[in-house]
Amino acid sequence: KKITQNKSQGSVYFMEAFTNRINLGGKQARYYDLSHFNQPLDSSSTPRAPAHFYSGNSFTVGTYTPLLSKLATEFDISSLALRGYWYDKPQSRRLTREQDADMLIEFLEKTQDNPVVGIGHSQGATATAMAAAKRPELFSQLYLIEPVTFTKNQATLYNLLPRSVLLSREPFKSTLTKQSTWPSIHSYYESLRAQRAYKRISNKHLQVFAEQSLSKNTDGSYTLMFAPEQELANYFG
């Protein structure tokens, strides 16, 4: 159950300073220990409850920094990244929420001594709910933000649709043509700002989103940490 911390130097991305590695299912997974966000506890203070945050598809943990920095004042937070940007990236064309739930269960078994507050967004919320249904003793409470849910009939119909049909519809269609490499953080920010989906996000928070979505290449360009092909595989799940 050895857990090692990433000691890479020179990162300009704040959240990456809290990156760790752990072996899950025989793969090198990425997770974040955000306990250092917390200010020192007074001796008279009640210890913060352990919590886990599971992000949505295509969103790195760092893109949630404004939210997580606030949650960290109340909770000792860890966050397992979705498999799309683990160190050992999946090769499957279909990544399911059941698999994400199983990875979360293994992660909590290896890192936690007490039940955690499960917090999740979108597909991460769905996987958190599934994990809690399988292993309720691992969780003390759940906070689910916009979980992706289907009725039984909807799920049956969805699974019967041919891959070619799904690829002609959103969000599959736009993910297929999503630009993954950018000349600068600013160019990616400007692209996001022009999109309707990000209209209500403040300039400050959108800047954080842009910065935390990208990794710098040796030639000075930037690449999305969560690759579109991995995002697509999650949608098929």
Where are these regions (language model features)?
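Active-site loop/oxyanion-hole signature of alpha/beta-hydrolase fold enzymes
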Residues: S79-I119
